[in-house]
């Protein structure tokens, strides 16, 4: 399993591209996070690419728009098209995951332990803490995991948040790779949650199964 940034290059063994969109319903249903998975079954490798939601895209009307706002404007299809034009690829499948879906998927994968690098807190619109994490190594439940990948501070801003999202994903994937392939298949086949997707449960389960055997 690999992580990459930048544009994908053409190759004889073309991968299958999956776009995962994280929806922030509290911000008017904008795309809060984007992850592209390039699955190359022939090469037995998967590459994950984080796409900053604040990336500017130019449309045919010659107007600039932030990538995250394409979802609010035209839904998943609009965002999918924008990413295709940005990276010059054809996306085969996509899934939109909201906060509830994220919590459910992480809960089924099991507690994820990691080192929280700083104290993190955030108040919601009602003045209540919706993120509250102490510094240190600790197991995160699904709600805490959501807070970790959502958190943005003044020091490192959006870049820091993307780095945390990538770090969490690496640890999650390592956790899944430590389990039996059949267990991952069953977990995803009967438990994968998405508010909108054209990835079938069987396709998602197949990805999880093969992921277990990839370096």
Question: Which stretches of residues belong to each language-model region?
Answer:
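Non-catalytic, solvent-exposed segments at the cell envelope interface
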Residues: 1-215
């Amino acid at each position: 399993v690999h992580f990459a940034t930048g544009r994908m290059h053409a190759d004889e063994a073309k991968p299958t591209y999956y776009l995962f969109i994280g929806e922030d319903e509290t911000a008017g249903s904008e795309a809060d996070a984007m992850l592209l998975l390039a699955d190359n079954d022939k090469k037995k490798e998967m590459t994950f690419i984080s796409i900053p939601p604040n990336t500017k895209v130019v449309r045919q009307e010659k107007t600039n728009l932030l990538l995250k706002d394409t979802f609010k404007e035209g839904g998943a299809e609009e965002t999918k098209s924008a990413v295709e034009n940005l990276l010059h690829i054809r996306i085969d499948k996509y899934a939109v995951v909201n906060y509830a879906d994220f919590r459910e998927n992480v809960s089924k994968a099991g507690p994820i332990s990691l080192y929280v690098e700083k104290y993190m807190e955030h108040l919601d619109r009602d003045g209540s803490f919706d993120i509250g994490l102490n510094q240190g190594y600790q197991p995160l439940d699904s709600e805490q995991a959501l807070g970790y990948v959502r958190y943005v501070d003044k020091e490192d801003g959006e870049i820091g948040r993307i780095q945390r999202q990538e770090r969490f994903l690496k640890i999650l994937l390592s956790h899944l790779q430590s389990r039996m392939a059949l267990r991952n298949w069953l977990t995803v086949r009967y438990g994968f949650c998405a508010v909108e997707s054209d990835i079938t449960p069987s396709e998602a389960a197949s990805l999880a199964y093969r992921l277990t055997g990839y370096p």
